[in-house]
A protein has these predicted regions:
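Extended, subdomain-level signal for the structured scaffold at the beginning of enzyme domains
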Residues: 1-99
């Protein structure tokens, strides 16, 4: 049995849902994969089309990841100015094997 491979999708308000759900569909099928949806605040998060993701974890509560994925979206500019989000990206990326983004 393969060891656990933690995939973290670091999302933010107005993320494009397809930029998250498309890669999730593929990466969740990796042997031993455990996908985590996380944001700075956790809880619920609204994507750019109004779709609401529930039970989003707080990035600060995620200890580590093997792959960090940052989806694109209409909230990208605001996300790039969010010091807390960028700090969590840096923290998780420091020990991740892969750091990826989608579209943006």
């Amino acid at each position: 049995m393969a060891s656990e491979f933690v995939v973290v999708f670091a999302v933010y308000p107005r993320v494009t849902q397809l930029d998250f759900t498309g890669p999730h569909e593929v990466l969740s099928r990796l042997p031993g994969a455990r996908c985590v949806l996380a944001s700075v605040q956790g809880g619920e998060l609204e994507a750019d089309g109004g779709l609401v993701f529930a039970h989003v974890r707080r990035l600060a509560d995620v200890e580590r990841c093997d792959l960090l994925c940052v989806p694109g979206g209409f909230g990208t500019i605001e996300a790039m100015e969010d010091a807390a989000l960028l700090a969590e990206h840096r923290r998780l990326a420091a020990s991740a094997r892969y750091v990826t983004s989608v579209c943006t």
